[in-house]
Amino acid sequence: MRLFVSEGAPGSLPVLAAAGRAQGRAELLISTVGPEECVVPFLTRPKVPVLQLDSGNYLFSTSAICRYFFLLSGWEQDDLTNQWLEWEATELQPALSAALYYLVVQGKKGEDVLGPVRRALTHIDHSLSRRSCPFLAGETESLADIVLWGALYPLLQDPSYLPEELGALHSWFQTLSSQEPCQRAAETVLKQQGVLALRPYLQKQPQPSSLEGRLVSNEPEEEELATLSEEEIAVAVAAWEKGLESLPPLRPQQNPVLPVAGERNVLITSALPYVNNVPHLGNIIGCVLSADVFARYSRLRQWNTLYLCGTDEYGTATETKAMEEGLTPQEICDKYHVIHADIYRWFNISFDFFGRTTTPQQTKITQDIFQRLLARGFVLQDTVEQLRCEHCARFLADRFVEGVCPFCGYEEARGDQCDKCGKLINAIELKKPQCKVCRSCPVVKSSQHLFLDLPKLAARVEEWLEKTLPGSDWTANARFIIRSWLRDGLKPRCITRDLKWGTPVPLEGFEDKVFYVWFDATIGYLSITANYTDQWEKWWKNPEQVNLYQFMAKDNVPFHGIVFPSSALGAEDNYTLVSHLIATEYLNYEDGKFSKSRGVGVFGDMAQDTGIPADIWRFYLLYNRPEGQDSAFSWTDMLFKNNSELLNNLGNFINRAGMFVSKFFGGFVPEMVLTSDDQRLLTHITLELQHYHQLLEKVRIRDALRSILTISRHGNQYIQVNEPWKRIKGGEADRQRAGTVTGLAVNIAALLSVMLQPYMPTVSATIQAQLQLPPPACSILPTNFLCTLPAGHQIGTVSPLFQKLENDQIESLKQRFSGGQAKASPKTAAGLTTAGPQQIQALTEEVTKQGNIVRELKAQKADKNQIAAEVAKLLDLKKQLALAEGKPLETSKGKKKK
């Protein structure tokens, strides 16, 4: 046999890996040819890879060649593998061809490349995690694994295109990539050039047609590929039939909440926001909103949960703000603490306690940790060269200095950190420094300060991380940042400042100094807990019984992952350290950054004045949560997500399910006689619910939200296929079928109301009130889909959950929050803003689908009111499409009255 491959031809990867697996089973000569060489004489265009058999026949399909090698090695075919191969050819390959073409030939990056394949990657990840198997077809590697690995390798070998949140896919890919046949194949084809090795080959390929709409819109219909076993169906049906009786008893409420031996005790913190800043949407999603979702989920799981946060009130920033506003630091703290609390209250953040750091408990606990570190030799004294403003007659703390960043040249870098490149800075390193108060140029002078001896504590920190990180849910960016700090070597870190507003340093000779915020801000979690309960040590000196989850943006990782653990380990007082450090990337605003001074972006105190409910803000921010990479808030996208995902998908299904109960069955849930198809639906929903649990337990908040929308789509499809509004008018069998469909649908709505609770608590409560969901079912989320609304249950009054966002409303808000960018914003016809091609394609498909529904109803001479309702939906979708395309809306001419 002779195998012809070509360097830079992606199809050569899987066949070489498969050939390596069959090594020694037959004589094989491998020849490298150019991509334009005609190996197969009867093909009209060049094709590689090609396998020439001993018989003289040729195989020139990648999967056929790989199958041949696997059969040689004794592998037996199975249906699931064949299904994966069909899917790879029809769905994955077109998407990958587009992604690789965009990346290699057109030089695109980021979501432009990942977008076409995101749906396919999510499907692979979902399938792997749901089956709980390491490989696609089971416990052992199969032909499907090699073919899909080879197809994906050129793209995913760059870690930035392997989404960290797709954990099962990540593990599968790394397992295969580490195998010797796969490594040799990659070396042969890519020649250590990475994906650029494919350029000569891809440049000769036709430009791919637009695939985004078909491949990315909405979510993959997993049920088309999922193979349900009889056992899975039986388990799902048995759980359904047990209903409410299978729910555990509600946890008794505690006040205060304290750890309980033998239970899962979950302590959750959000990074403490600086009191002097009004939080913008990026601050809210990065810390408090993400933590709130997990806290609400923890309570639904009946875990013993305490969720804390508070304002960080000491430090230079507060003194600076006090000067700007002509107030004392304490007055500034009092004023802005109330602003923060009001904002989080409006966003429905469910803190058990929201405190502050300007308290006696903060002083006591911080000074105690310092004294313990000092006594154990972990505090150093040294002279520091500092900037002093002679005009203001004082040393300038970091935030009182601005200048040019020595690393990236950013002209507005602070004396502690550059907001552009993110690097930490010593104030004296700034170029062209200026006093922030008087704008004069400061001089360099010496001052005695205290340092935390991080090098001396490094071994303890590394030992702790080695025990903590495996099996934990630290996000990838948090792991990377911590490893970078350790790799570069820890350095002594100054923990004092020449300020008045802060925790006093309890050491002779340093009475005129305070602790630096990096040292004592993270101790704020402890003091806030101490203000909540005098038994705070049961949470913070109890590492054996407490799971600590800390939520933050990535710039806070060093202080939570290095500085505080070093202090706590050095204090040797059995402190609870972070078990799971959850860090987000950054949320930008449209095409730029949030800026209060320039009036760009939505800040927390402004959101409530937009007329958009808090739950809609929560939904969109969580849907767009910057998990693996930075994301951006977009008004156009917010309109689209509200009108498509909430109004047309989720809200439409829940409203229809409830209305059918009210309209057809007098408000009482009808009897349900489940068919085999109904039982399969039960099982699909149970599996999706379990996937939701798996995701949230791993704190993959954004992906779990998509599970809710997937279940809602299942429900909409179920209603559309079974047409209960028609069956209710038929004979006894049809009416019974209408009852079953309606009863099952309204129970799906009840399940969704509980799954929604962490994300949209007000909407969740509204649904539960409309359905009159029994109290235990409102507060507990089981792992199986249960019948919580049995036959005979009476529901309440059903009404729509969501309102449509209009384009003129959103355009007005966009202009309002655009600051100086408003004048420069390019506009399309009639001043409208276009949506992205993915959204336009999705709307085009919805218009086509709805048009078919209208034509079908007219052909069947259905009820006029029903036709009118569907026509109204069609017109509304057409309007959304026109707005998305930036076209002026046509004025309806209507029919002339006679």
Swiss-Prot record:
UniProt keyword Aminoacyl-tRNA synthetase present: yes
Annotated EC: 6.1.1.10
Keywords: Aminoacyl-tRNA synthetase, ATP-binding, Cytoplasm, Ligase, Nucleotide-binding, Nucleus, Phosphoprotein, Protein biosynthesis, RNA-binding, tRNA-binding
Sequence motif 'HIGH' region, location on chain: 273-283
A Pfam family per the record: GST_C
CDD domains per UniProt: Anticodon_Ia_Met, GST_C_MetRS_N, MetRS_core, MetRS_RNA
Listed PROSITE patterns: AA_TRNA_LIGASE_I (PS00178), GST_CTER (PS50405), WHEP_TRS_1 (PS00762), WHEP_TRS_2 (PS51185)
Localization (cell): Cytoplasm, Cytosol; Nucleus, Nucleolus
Transmembrane segments: none
Domain GST C-terminal: 74-198
Stretches assigned to the WHEP-TRS domain: 839-895
UniProt modified residues of type Phosphothreonine: T833
UniProt modified residues of type Phosphoserine: S825
Binding site for ATP: K596
Enzyme class: ligase
Reactions the enzyme catalyzes: tRNA(Met) + L-methionine + ATP = L-methionyl-tRNA(Met) + AMP + diphosphate
Function: Catalyzes the specific attachment of an amino acid to its cognate tRNA in a 2 step reaction: the amino acid (AA) is first activated by ATP to form AA-AMP and then transferred to the acceptor end of the tRNA. Plays a role in the synthesis of ribosomal RNA in the nucleolus.
Family (UniProt): Belongs to the class-I aminoacyl-tRNA synthetase family.
Name listed for the protein in its UniProt record: Methionine--tRNA ligase, cytoplasmic
Source organism per UniProt: Bos taurus (Bovine)
Gene name of the encoded protein: MARS1
